[in-house]
From Swiss-Prot:
Protein name: Conotoxin Im11.11
Free-text function comment from the UniProt entry: Probable neurotoxin.
Further facts: The mature protein is identical to the Conus litteratus toxin AC C7DQX6.
Compartment annotation: Secreted
Amino acid sequence: MFRLTSVGCILLVIAFLNLVGLTNACTSEGYSCSSDSNCCKNVCCWNVCESHCRHPGKRTRLQGFFKHRR
């Protein structure tokens, strides 16, 4: 009787820990986010989880400027 109860308690604890782990899951790279704390790597750039924020260089901004002028 004691073994059955202790095994049941252990399984209940494992199930509870899995439930807590699922509710605090972080967002993977490439998925949408609202803040840095939502992302696994804690970098939310332009509402998307990234490994690091990329800031476009002068050439990229200039090309974008000319595309919008047409």
